[in-house]
Each structure stands twice: as C-alpha cells, then as structure tokens.
Amino acid sequence: MTQHDRLLIIDFGSQVTQLIARRLRELNVYCEIHPYQNVTEAFLKGFAPKAVIFSGGPSSVFAEGAPMPPAGVFDLGVPILGICYGQQVMMHCLGGKVERGHGTAEFGRAFVTPTAERLAILDGWFEEGREQVWMSHGDHVSQIAPGFQVFGTSPNAPFAITGDPARHFYAVQFHPEVHHTPKGAKLYENFVRLAGFKGDWTMGAYREEAIARIRAQVGDQKVICGLSGGVDSSVAAVLIHEAIGDQLTCVFVDHGLLRLGEAEQVVKMFRDHYNMPLIHADESDLFLGALEGVSDPEVKRKTIGRLFIDVFQKHAADVGGATFLAQGTLYPDVIESVSFSGGPSVTIKSHHNVGGLPEKMGLKLVEPLRELFKDEVRALGRELGLPESFIGRHPFPGPGLAIRCPGEITREKLEILRRADAVYIDQIRRHGLYDEIWQAFVALLPVRTVGVMGDGRTYDYACALRAVTSVDGMTADYYPFTHDFLGETATRIINEVQGINRVTYDITSKPPGTIEWE
C-alpha cells in the first residue's frame, strides 16, 4: 500500500481544529489530529510527520498546567505552523514573550497589513494591500523569539504573522481555517507546498488501500453491517462488499419511520443493483406499538435506540458465524473519542446507533471510513459508483420521522407527514434548489386548525416547512425562499395531501433553535 506523507495537527483545544484538517484534506494532504497530551517524543518518532501544525485553544500560557507542545517537536527538522494559541505557545517555548490580554483582545474580523519583507507562505496574499482575517485571542505576543521576523500586523496584534524562514517555523495570531479568513486556504496551500507534500491523498487511492486493509483484517470470516440507508453506512457496505463479496450480509431494520418509498429504494439498490445478501427486517409494528402514546422526544429517541439493538441482534443471529460488525464510523467520531478534554467517547450518531453492540454480540469491528470526513465519504461514494441522487441526499436523523412529528405518533400522522414531505422535496428539486440547501423537511405540528375547502369547513393539521443552509450542521440559517415558491408549495401540499389545511415556514436560525424540531 502507498505510504502517504503525514501531517500532524497537535490539538490545544480549539473549537475549529477539525476545520484545519478539512482544509488540508481538500488539498489532498493526509493529516491526523491528536490532543497535545497524547503526543510524546515516542509518538512523534513513530508518526514521523512531514510537517506539524499547532492548533488554537482557550488556554493562556500563563495558566498553571497550560498545554505545551511535546519535547523534541522543534528538533524534528520539519516545517511547523502555529495558529492563535499555537503562535503564543511557540513564542513562549522558543524565547519570545507573551502578554496577558489587557485591552488588546481581538474577537472577530480584523485586517492584517504586510511589512516590507515578504514570505513564501504568503504567496497570493496582500495583492490589494491588506487581508481580512478572523481573530479570537485574549493574550498576545509582545516579543518574537530569536530568528523570527514580522511579516504582518493588525491594530491589536503587532505580530499577527511571524516566521523564521531558515527553520520553516511560521506563526499567525488569526484563524486561517475559518471562512471569515478568505485567503486562509491559500496560506495552508503554501505551507504544504513548502513542506514538500505530494498531494496524493485521493479517494481513488483510499479505495484501493481500504479494500486491501479489509481483506487483511477479515480474511475468510463473515461480516454483518447495520444498513440504515444513510450515506455513511451505505458507502461502508459497498466498499466492504467490493472487498469480500458475499462474506458480508447487511441487516436493514425498517422501523416504520422512514420517508415515502425509502425502504423500497434501499432494498432495490442493495439487493437488486449491488446483489448484496440483505436481510430486510420490517419491524414497523413493533416500533410503532412501543411508541404509542409517547410524546416526550427523549423517550422517543431512547425507545427507538433500545428496540433497534434488540431487533438487530435478533436478525444478525440469523446470519450465523459472523465475527465482525461493520460500522460507518467517521473521523470526527474518532477525534471526539480521544478529545482534547480527555472526556469519554461520544455515542456515534448514526441512523442505526449500534453503540454497545460489538461487546454484547462478541464481535470485532470493521470501520473502513474512520479516517474520513463526511465530504470525503461522499467523494468515496462517487468513486464507488453510488448514484449522485443518493450520495447528495440531505441528512436524515436516526429516529426518522418520529422527531419530525412533535407529540404523539400515529400511523395516520406519519402517512400525512410522508406525503407532505415528498411534495416539498419535489418542489425544491423542480426549482433546482436541492443542492443549495443543507437540509429540508416538513414537520407535522400537533395542532389542528380550521379551514375552508370548497364550500365546506375543514379541521386538519398544520405543518411547518424547514430549510436551512449550513457548512457542518453546527450553525445554520434559514433558506431565503421567494414568496412565490412558498405560496406554490403551500398550495400543492394543501391540494395534494389530505389532512393538512395550513402551511407555515420556520425561519429560526441555529442557534437559538435546532435544525430538527425535536
């Protein structure tokens, strides 16, 4: 297998460290994030990074037990880039000075102007005199370390960009990874170019390497995969099937909370198109029976999660002889499990939510996507030939329509919701807006309203349309549909879906709201 050059990101606790990794992956550079306390001299020797980045973080170098880089990192002889706290800790360790933030803190947009000296890492910068950047710091560097020069300043950060070109050490006080620093990606591009990365991290290469790893790990043993119909588990299943063929059996649990025609689409694609061994477990009666009378959203989630584990175990036992369980774990899940704070692993938020299953069933894990971000999973899906209509689908929550139907769930409500949602998504696609929107759906509200249709009075449900734009789902804003679009959509839903006589549009951002209603 190809040995990729590797870049190490040492995490000092920034909320946006994952964005650094995503920017580098977009440049076809393989990188890993590791919390500072796990990076020892022995780790550095084994990892053998071609370059190192120090992330930002909330700490102060003056605090007792402040996060510090590992001994020996400055002696590796590789380029190092320090960001925000990473700059401060670099200066602190190499002989510069840092001052507490008394009246010089910067949070938000700032403008950096260049000095007379130019630096190769800043190629493409300052073509129009100054550059917008995003600052988020209290303390600041007051004296640079020996060997460093100043290459950019801002009103409250006189050492906004510093560097020691001889040692290829660079440090900036701002965050180049966020989109509020428009030329931040260019800075990362320059850094990896100066470090000599080949840019050979592609999904084509990953596909070949992952297949080889799966075959080596599994041998001639059997694997079961909880298939949800979501992108992650589907890409994992197709990749594993390409590696080991019919040694893989997928278990698709239909809990009766899927969208219109979704179960049939999943079965058709995986059983008929990909010819995978597939157990289609229609357990909708079990799930809907258990949810009868339940209105609390947390109770809904826990009930669905508990039943899924029971049902999955029952049907997986039918496979017989399986020794591996496949999961669509992604790199953000792995990062969180070894987080900066040292906190416990988070539950993997997948549709099938199989947390605890490997231990209960005595199975070993196969996680072929654990090195990838979501956008890379989609790219791998395209590489594997999954249809674009499937790869580009909006996120869908694990509990399904249960959390888009506030209050008690009934079969009647679910059917109304499915049909309204199908009309809404069809409208969005007809107008060519689907790919502009992060997520769109209908929520069926637990209220009935009076209406007039023809010459008669109606007393039917109200629904809310939801559509948001987002980069990662952490924050979101409502999509600015035209009034004509909303009017046309409301008319179609009321005319085509029996049981709804009023349509509203939810214009709440996240925060303060969440994307889903429950």
Curated annotation (Swiss-Prot):
Enzyme class, broadest EC rank: ligase
Pathway: Purine metabolism; GMP biosynthesis; GMP from XMP (L-Gln route): step 1/1
Domain GMPS ATP-PPase: 201-393
One cellular component term from this protein's GO annotations in UniProt: cytosol
Name of the protein described by the UniProt record: GMP synthase [glutamine-hydrolyzing]
GN (gene name): guaA
Organism lineage string: Bacteria, Pseudomonadati, Pseudomonadota, Alphaproteobacteria, Rhodobacterales
Subunit structure: Homodimer.
Keyword terms, alphabetized: ATP-binding, Glutamine amidotransferase, GMP biosynthesis, Ligase, Nucleotide-binding, Purine biosynthesis
UniProt xrefs under CDD domains: GATase1_GMP_Synthase, GMP_synthase_C
